[in-house]
Amino acid sequence: MTLSEINAQIMFQTNNDIDDLGDFKPHITDYINQGYDLLVEAYTGEHVTADSETYPALVDNSDKPNLPEYSHRAIVDFATYLIYRNGNIVKQNRGQAYYSAFYEVLVKLKYEGGTRNKPLRFINIYKD
C-alpha cells in the first residue's frame, strides 16, 4: 500500500465524514507515521526517522511501508483509531475496534520478529 492508498483507506473507514475532515487532515500523515513507527519497533526494534535508510518516514504519496504486506492495513487501522479517539463517546467506541485490529497485527509482528524478537536457542550454556 502506498501513502496515497493508505490515506484513501482512512477516508473510507471514517465514512468520508467531511465535518471532521478539517480536524484531522493536517495530522493524518503524523498519525500514519506514528502507527508505522510502532509496527517497525515491534518488528525490528528500530524507529522510523526521516533520515533512516531502512525505515524512512512516509512522506511522498508513492512511499510504501517497509514491512510485510499484511501489516499495511494495521497502519490504516491505527490512524483511524487516532482520529476517533478524541471524538464523542460513539466515535471513541467505534475507534476501539480499529485499535484492537491494529494490536493483533502488532503482536503478530512482534512474534514474527525481524531481528529483535527471534527466539534464542542455546546449544550449550556451559563453557568447556
Summary of predicted features, one role per range:
Residues 25, 65-69, 88:
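Short, charged/polar micro-motifs that form catalytic or ligand-binding hotspots
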Residues 7, 29, 76, 96-99:
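Extracytoplasmic/secreted envelope proteins and their assembly/folding machinery
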